Amino acid sequence: MLHDEPTLAEYDAFAAVFNEIAYNCGAIAAGYDFNCALFSTYAGSDCIGSSYETYVNKYATLMQDTRISFDNYPFYYVSKDGIFNSSSENLLEDSWYSDMQTVRANANGKGICIQSFTAGAQVESSWFTKTTKYRYIDKEAEISMQVYTALAYGFTNLDYFVYWDTMVRAMHEANGNTGQVFQKTPIMWNDASDWSKGHYQSDYYDWIKNTNAEAKSLFEILSKFTSTGVQLIDGSTSGSNAFGSATTTNTTNAIAVSATYDMVVGGFTADGYNGYLAVNADFPDDSGTRTNTATFTVGMQYSKAIVYVDGIATVVRVAKDGTFDLNIGCGEGIFIIPIA
């Protein structure tokens, strides 16, 4: 990684160093890979400048032989009484989808690979009380939803935020912050006050491991296709529609979809076939078990659809009216290929 979260003001100096290493020193020719984790919109104007479009575009223009990735913890609580507790309200960051859209748009045409950093740790800290936002992950569906959504947007590399909680906490405490920064992480100490007592793998470790295995199986299929953009489907259930300023970008091979809850549908194409990665964009409920029922209309020229779930293919029959129904689990995604 070249840099974590560079500001717009740092770009010119950053690009000079990158060019020296990448080209003058021959790192690119030698096969080395470079990436940089950019800020997301919610970092604010001090970091990204006047607009996220300007921030991402300048990076993509200056440093084309890199991968673009960005930091975003999309799930958060807003405290109702000044402290983090059960009265807090669960929300989804409304810039999450639009940030992915901006990164994708600026990478396309420049040959830049796009990489997603998946939030895999929970933040509960006095450091965040200035915004009353507490970034969190507390179920596997919140990890898998991020991964499947990134794949639907055409991201081709995945990475995860994973921390040893006390190490990051100690760094912040050294700066006068006594809040517990990353309270729940994939690796936890048995005794945070005595590191000699060792550590253990938490549920977060298994959640990431399981999700990554699913993503790897799916990507083996997706890698044979070319991404054509996404459709953002507003669910019929009141209280959904949380895509913010993001818009549908797939006008090449769009599919008609109606769903109970919000849905992201990534479009793909390969050798005359259309593919669709349908992701349940319903904000994960407390149980993590709520499914999204969707009707897909592919047309009467199709007789069936191959449906991949966790990399395993099944065949779904298309009705005479050209439709078929599917249930998509909380935080899950399925890949669909209509067949004549």
Task: Give the predicted meaning of each segment.
Residues 1-340:
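Glycan-processing catalytic domains of CAZymes
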